[in-house]
């Protein structure tokens, strides 16, 4: 199963978030998953890469020409360079069976919203799990509730993804859906 992990590349973030990346990616690599990610060697993204390397899993990184220099640190994966972030998002989506969204910044939000919209508009059944430990995504989820209340989106938007609050919930959700995905 190819799992697309969305997360941060910023080193300045709290180590707490990096520990989430290590825990989740270690669990996935131990459960015979392969990694699809926006090829970056730093912070949460780099930690995910390292955990999958340790388990000799297949790794597929996608990046744009602006970040191609970082690929020299990602020697254990197949690297794909796409001209735009639009192409990058599409190829990561198409090459994954499951999407796991960890805490992240504007790139992570952009990817998450793109994949929710792709699922909503094109009836994709690809699972999306938002890992909301420490209530990181509370304001995002509140914004979606406001959009529903103001009738900008239907309430079924919340059916496009699953929210988990900790590693235990994540593992349970993963095992429940594992048989339903490649």
Model-inferred region functions:
Residues 1-59:
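Glycine-rich beta-alpha loop segments
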Residues 98, 150-182:
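A charged, well-structured terminal subsegment
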Residues 63, 119-141, 155-156:
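Short, acidic/small-residue loops that bind anionic groups at enzyme active sites
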Residues 43-47, 136-148:
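Glycine-rich, charge-decorated loop segments at or immediately adjacent to ligand/cofactor-binding or catalytic sites
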Residues 44-103, 107-108:
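Acidic/glycine-enriched connector segments
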Residues 34-38, 101, 129-130:
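Short catalytic-loop micro-motif centered on adjacent basic/acidic residues
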Residues 14, 109-112:
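Glycine/threonine-rich flexible loop motifs
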């Amino acid at each position: 199963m190819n799992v697309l992990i969305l997360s941060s590349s910023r080193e300045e973030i709290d180590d707490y978030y990096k520990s989430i990346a290590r825990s989740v990616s270690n669990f996935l690599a131990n459960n015979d998953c392969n990694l699809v990610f926006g090829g970056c060697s730093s912070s949460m993204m780099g930690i995910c890469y390292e955990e999958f390397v340790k388990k000799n899993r297949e790794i597929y990184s996608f990046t744009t020409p602006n970040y191609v220099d970082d690929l020299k640190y990602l020697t254990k994966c197949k690297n794909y360079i796409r001209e735009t972030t639009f192409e990058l998002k599409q190829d990561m989506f198409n090459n994954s069976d499951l999407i796991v969204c960890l805490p992240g910044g504007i790139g992570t939000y952009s990817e998450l919203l793109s994949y929710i919209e792709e699922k909503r508009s094109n009836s994709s059944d690809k699972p999306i799990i938002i890992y909301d430990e420490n209530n990181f995504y509370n304001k995002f989820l509140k914004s979606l509730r406001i959009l529903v209340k103001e009738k900008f989106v239907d309430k079924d938007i919340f059916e496009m993804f699953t929210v988990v609050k900790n590693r235990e919930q994540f593992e349970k959700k993963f095992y429940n859906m594992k048989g339903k995905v490649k």
